[in-house]
């Protein structure tokens, strides 16, 4: 299969190119497209065979649910068994945007899309290309990240092509994404709403809108993979570069000292070592490759650069990677959640 890459201006969308992509979706084929979070790999969410193609192209376990992308709230109503009042409040506040809600599904949604679950994850993306594709196709679009399962999520079309070239018919190239990490996922099927995946929309933001407590699933920081995942990203190793990644957490001075010791040890054995640092510390490391993820206080930049940097280390063929910890106040939990999964929960406290 030849993969067609179509450059598309998000602010001046070519109708003919979008019609071609929409027709592929209607035929049960796959199209990769930009969202404000990461690039998604889309197919008709209500077409069981189309959803199966997503799992096959990504090498994704079939019990890992897909997020259904919509362009209007009525589409949530059309596939939900019931619509919690919380869903309406959250949609008013955060949609379109990087928030996914889990509700009970009705019979329209195939189990191939929900990973065998009785619940369905739903989001209205903010990116104009994503919204136009949903509208033009007339389909609800199931879309996980457009990458090989387990690898860092794609924040540019080139990342999608690297992973899925020859496996899907089309990639819509809308340029680099804005946020860089996946949406927050909130489960609305329990008595108390619960965050199953942290993201740009924080617990505090959700609680302010809902006027009630929002819990955080312990699995966000745990490494247990025995339970059935209710949301994408909960069970399997994700976001991982080829090289072994270890996080080093502690006071900045101690972290720099420890990482340099670890780097020296690896280099003695002839290994090529990379370090993920910040603007404040990048000049203090003696690794083969040192990359700054941004200023420590700039959470948005850290989130936006994370996956791109992990992929760049693959290009540089490093043997080991050490990273500072980025437990910042606002979206730091989301950033650390992704890093912990990428590192297979390998953390050194110093």
Where are these regions (language model features)?
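Active-site-adjacent structural elements in enzyme catalytic cores
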Residues: 1-350
